[in-house]
Every structure is written in C-alpha cells, then in structure tokens.
Amino acid sequence: MPDDALPFPRGTHELALDPEVLARELAEELLGDPLDDLDTAEPSAGDVAAECDLGLELLAGDAEQRMQGLRIFCEHRDPRAIPRLLPLLQASCPIVRMSAVYALGRNPSPLAVEPLLGLLTADDNGYVRKAVAWSLGNYPDAPVLNPLIRSLQFDVAAVRLWAASSLADAGGTGPAKADPAASQLLLSLRIDSEPAVRSNSAWGLGRLYPDLVEPRQREVVETLVHTMLHDADSAVRDEARLALEQLEQPDVLERLQTLVDEGLIG
C-alpha cells in the first residue's frame, strides 16, 4: 500500500464500502483518459437532467442513498447540488467527505473554496486530502496556489501526486502564478522520493511552459533533459521526454534528435 493509505476512523462501518476501492473507482471515473470515452454514446441532456434530479433526491436520503447521489455528482454538473454537497464536507465519515470533495471538484463553487482548503490542511485522512488536491485543480482562480505548494512539499505521496498535477492548473493562469508553481515542480522533480510525483511534476512543467518567462523556460528544459537522461525510474524518464516533445520547440526537438543519433536515448 502507498503511504497515503491511512487508517480510517471507527465510524466508517456505517457504510459497507471499502475506502480504497471507492477512492480508486472515483479516481478512475474522474481522472480517466478522455480517449477511453470516444466510442461511448453521450447521454442526452434529458437523461443527464433526470439523473441529476434523482441525485438531488438521493442526497437527502439515508447513508446508502447519499453515497449514490454523491456518485452522480462526481460525474455530472448541476449547480443545484452545491447547497447539498457543502454540508457533507463536515461529515464524520471520511468516505462521505472524500466523495463530497470529488463532487465539488466536478461542480466547482466559490462557496467550496474555504472549506476545501481547510480540509487540505487539517483533515487527518489521506484519502480526503488526496481528493482535495485533485479538486483544487478545478479552482485555478481561487487562492489555491500556496496551499498546493505546501502539500507538494510536506504531505504523503498520493496527496503530493495530485498536488503536482493541480499546480499545473492553478499556475496556468498567467506568469505571476506560473513561476512559483514551476519553481516548486522543478524542486519536486529533482528531489521527491516518489517516482509518480516526479512524473506528474514533469508533466506539470510541460503544461506551464508557455506561461513562463524565458529564463525559467530554459531551466525547465535543462531540468527535463537531465531527468530524461538520469532519473532512476524509467517511467519518469519517459514522462520527461514526452514533456519535452510536447513543447514543440524546434531547438528542443533538434536536441532530442541529437541525443537519439548519439545513442543516449532510444
């Protein structure tokens, strides 16, 4: 188990759910590859509206119904759900809190910013903080940059993983935010002990590159090249190379081709 697999309070027996399985299923639904859905028929607007109506009713029901309602709003957006989701951030059951956090990531609201930030810093459950780290990526205009940086510096691996990804979204609104976000991602790419965090840091740097000033862009390129050549984990090396290729900078692509010709990369 990764080090984010924290014990759950005794109160979780009120829902007959495995928190790890639920967290994984919610993450797959929310974070899956969009290409996987290309062959799937989109539900009609009427079907979505009907499902959201049902979700609102379920949120007002018993514990099992409430979880079903939360799953609906992890998938669909409906502003009517916000007043019913916000109180669930204070639920005693961490599974309910986690699910409400994911639902508010799918249904962003200014009213959710303060309680989400409170959970990121103070919730004692790693699954909940992990969900918050993902959800805050959908709040790029809110004051989430510094809290995400702190999480990337100090929290457990699974929280750092999504903090790195969300920093790319939070920092992608202009140079003023992009530079501090890139600074932390560069540091995490160099020193984080968890390969998945380093991979997401490399991906995030590629996303931020267009919003960075030229000296920082050079540092990003040099760090990604060094990672591509020297990181101990092959997945991190591959992610760094992909990030470099996706910059679509002629000088960077030429440099990569030279490394291929010299046999330093495949």
Enumerate the predicted regions with their spans.
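Structural detector for internal amphipathic alpha-helices that build alpha-solenoid repeat scaffolds
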Residues: 24-46, 64-79, 83, 87-90, ...
